[in-house]
Amino acid sequence: MDSMRRMNAYVKLNFQRCLSQGKTLVICLCLAVFFYLYFGDVRGGLMESGQKIGIMEMFLVVTNNMYTSFTIWIGFVLIICDSPYRDDGVYQYLLRTSRRSWLWGQIVYIVAITVIYFAYIFLLLLLLIVPQVTFQTAWTTTFVKMINAPFGYGISNYFSFPVSVMRQTTALQLFGRCIVLCMMIGMATGFLTMMLHMLWPSGPGIAIGGIGIAMDYWATVVRVGVTSKYLLFISPFSMSRVGNLSTTAFNRVNPTFSYACLFLAGMILVPLAVMNLKIGRYDYS
């Protein structure tokens, strides 16, 4: 019980520090303004036509479109780059007291902040289209029309989703896969960032996320040379675009959902093992 109480205290302390930073508020406001400007008067377009669109479809679009996806992941990297928060003398204190409770507190915080971040993205999209929203699990005809003619719905920016994927899977199936991948990518980014801080206390916390964003940009935007093709199989942020994943094991061009889950699971387990080993040693300072 004492260990659980200490762990909860560390989680609470991390959230207090995160919310007390002006950076967090700025990121949340920037995301809200970005999506508002990006989708324009989408609510007005839907109300004028008397149609409704699925919230799951909107979430799939923003996570599959490279520009909105870049924005989402950059915001997440900027929030998570401070994990774990470092105080002078805290590690020496932990060596004599609750090292495991501290470690579990950091892990729970990273998982929780990942869930909250994407819940916030989901809420922003919901506010953009309410009350013209539906929660049906199948693809809506409105979504198909919006892909073909986004200007008719007040959207002046890029709005697209692969129709070939829509013919093979339902919106609910793809949404579930997208949520799983986003959660795993977020946790992997947080754990790798935390591992970097534990191995290199004075190192740049944004390095892990920065490298991931650069890999994603090279694999999806630059697309120069053979390396860009192979980067799709090792770039975690690229795997969040479920519309670009292969739907068959015989397609060697893009990774499958199963491969992405296994790869990301490895990215989660490796830093956890390293951190568990590091926190148990008395040379951690």
Report the location of each language-model feature.
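Membrane-interface helix-boundary motifs at transmembrane edges
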Residues: 18-19, 100-101, 196-202, 280-281
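Transmembrane helix boundary and interhelical loop/hinge segments in multi-pass membrane proteins
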Residues: 79-95, 99
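Aromatic- and glycine-rich beta-strand/loop motifs that create alpha-glucan
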Residues: 1-27
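Interfacial transmembrane-helix starts/ends
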Residues: 11, 15, 19, 100-111
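Aromatic-anchored segments of alpha-helical transmembrane domains
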Residues: 32-39, 211-222, 239-241
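Junction motif at the cytosolic side of a transmembrane helix
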Residues: 192-199, 265-285
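Secretory targeting signals
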Residues: 35-83, 104-198, 233-262
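Central hydrophobic cores of alpha-helical transmembrane segments
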Residues: 28-32, 203-217, 234
